[in-house]
Amino acid sequence: MGHSPPVLPLCASVSLLGGLTFGYELAVISGALLPLQLDFGLSCLEQEFLVGSLLLGALLASLVGGFLIDCYGRKQAILGSNLVLLAGSLTLGLAGSLAWLVLGRAVVGFAISLSSMACCIYVSELVGPRQRGVLVSLYEAGITVGILLSYALNYALAGTPWGWRHMFGWATAPAVLQSLSLLFLPAGTDETATHKDLIPLQGGEAPKLGPGRPRYSFLDLFRARDNMRGRTTVGLGLVLFQQLTGQPNVLCYASTIFSSVGFHGGSSAVLASVGLGAVKVAATLTAMGLVDRAGRRALLLAGCALMALSVSGIGLVSFAVPMDSGPSCLAVPNATGQTGLPGDSGLLQDSSLPPIPRTNEDQREPILSTAKKTKPHPRSGDPSAPPRLALSSALPGPPLPARGHALLRWTALLCLMVFVSAFSFGFGPVTWLVLSEIYPVEIRGRAFAFCNSFNWAANLFISLSFLDLIGTIGLSWTFLLYGLTAVLGLGFIYLFVPETKGQSLAEIDQQFQKRRFTLSFGHRQNSTGIPYSRIEISAAS
């Protein structure tokens, strides 16, 4: 179409490098925390505060980032976030005290949160319907690659003097490369000019921009106008079920489950990190290949169903199988949890939690017990704090034979792998893809950021409520409750989330405008021959 720069490869590099930066920054603390503890004499509380400072910065970005994205443009937001990330990385690399480390981590958290929102929106608007699913999902693949890359660099730099400074500094490399890629892509300050440049890529007609285009305020997200309330319901439902299915806490026990099947000591942590990382990469690549063929709705339904089965399986197994102890709070954290950020990776959600009160069921439920630790530690809801938990359980009646225990432990490991895979081709990439599609361009940044803030809040709520929930109903019933929540999420997706594959952003917007509230049953064809799944409950006024 006369474009000299290779637009699709550049879009792919923007998405991949953005995700790689995101994943690297999330995971790098796992290797840097132990040398930081030794160099600065950090207590458990100080370690948690350092790790949690990233969350504070990301939360701030989710609150104000949408306005920045809509006011200054997607491309400018990405470039600005990369500059902020460079400043944060420089602060971390030169830090001489805990205060500077916390400041640097908070700045980095702000940068990666803003970049994640802007990248998903920018790429979704830049490419056509046939490429949108693959290229936006590439961000999730970049996250998993970035996490694995951070593990490799952490290992290589672990024994070097001031190695943690280099660990933080290497995050600037993908950010610089992403900025260079953006220089050859259309700008976003002039909305009309930008969209005219994008028409050959979208393969459709130019949208009517200018005075005739509707203007939206933030409060319109909660009004019936153009079915904005229905769109917000879909967006919030997806991000909330993404977290309320319990994946921030289930993956805390990855290293424990690996240890229970015979991988003890350091090998347990390595396998929990690298092994699950490899599983996530494979599942994300599968999602990339299917998202524009099978569709967003199909992947969400399949992923949520498998998550419900697998987390329920872990809960049932934990009734009978005692788990081995985990690391102490001063050990290098095993980064195998989930942050709940866009493109959510599922590898960074270890929790640092205090002792859990025993249940009133005479130990009939598996419960958590804290490993030995050097200092008392207050409760923390930080989703990436260093772990120091162990699983223990006891069942009344005769113990299972050793062979039975082994079978159940391997079953728990299989369920964990299925859970990670299901999240990685379902909620992980598809949630953010759908959010980047369903809102009008004029308010897309603010709407995306609004939903993202609820994702962070739900992640924090799940982490904070975990102890009380286990103390009340026990570990096994907690996992079974997560399974029930996944079943409810399955129903929500089936009823409310339409299929958007193969449709331009303008067509998706028009479909939402025609209905105040929709339920999705089966598949049918619209007048343009593009399949989507919904039935009309009430016509728009």
Swiss-Prot record:
Mind listing the GO biological process terms from this record?
artery development; cell redox homeostasis; circulatory system development; D-glucose import across plasma membrane; D-glucose transmembrane transport; dehydroascorbic acid transport; embryonic skeletal joint development; galactose transmembrane transport
Membrane topology per the entry is: Multi-pass membrane protein
Where on this protein are sugars attached? 334
Q: Please tell me in which tissues this protein is expressed.
A: Widely expressed; highest levels in liver and pancreas.
Q: Which residues lie on this side of the membrane: Extracellular?
A: 37-48, 99-106, 156-166, 255-269, 320-414, 467-476
- PROSITE patterns recorded for this chain? MFS (PS50850), SUGAR_TRANSPORT_1 (PS00216)
Bilayer-crossing residues are 16-36, 49-69, 78-98, 107-127, 135-155, 167-187, 234-254, 270-290, 299-319, 415-435, 446-466, 477-497
- The principal location of this protein is membrane
Keyword Acetylation applies:
no
Q: Which residue ranges are assigned to the Cytoplasmic compartment in the record's topology?
A: 1-15, 70-77, 128-134, 188-233, 291-298, 436-445, 498-541
Q: Which reaction does it catalyse?
A: D-glucose(out) = D-glucose(in)
| Chain positions recorded as D-glucose binding sites | 242-243, 432
List the keywords (alphabetical).
Cytoplasm, Disease variant, Glycoprotein, Membrane, Sugar transport, Transmembrane, Transmembrane helix, Transport
Q: Pfam families from the entry?
A: Sugar_tr (PF00083)
Can you tell which superkingdom this protein's organism belongs to?
A: Eukaryota
Q: Where in the cell is it found?
A: Endomembrane system; Cytoplasm, Perinuclear region
Residues covered by region (Disordered): 340-388
InterPro entries from the xrefs?
MFS_dom, MFS_sugar_transport-like, MFS_Sugar_Transporter, MFS_trans_sf, Sugar/inositol_transpt, Sugar_transporter_CS
The record's Gene Ontology cellular component field reads: cytosol; endomembrane system; membrane; perinuclear region of cytoplasm; plasma membrane
Q: Which Gene Ontology MF annotations are present?
A: carbohydrate:proton symporter activity; D-glucose transmembrane transporter activity; dehydroascorbic acid transmembrane transporter activity
Function, as annotated, reads: Facilitative glucose transporter required for the development of the cardiovascular system.
Q: Which disease is it linked to?
A: Arterial tortuosity syndrome: An autosomal recessive disorder characterized by tortuosity and elongation of major arteries, often resulting in death at young age. Other typical features include aneurysms of large arteries and stenosis of the pulmonary artery, in association with facial features and several connective tissue manifestations such as soft skin and joint laxity. Histopathological findings include fragmentation of elastic fibers in the tunica media of large arteries.
Query: Which family is this sequence assigned to?
Result: Belongs to the major facilitator superfamily. Sugar transporter (TC 2.A.1.1) family. Glucose transporter subfamily.
Q: What is this protein called?
A: Solute carrier family 2, facilitated glucose transporter member 10
Origin species, per record, is Homo sapiens (Human)
What phylogenetic lineage does the species belong to?
Answer: Eukaryota, Metazoa, Chordata, Craniata, Vertebrata
**Gene assigned in the entry:** SLC2A10
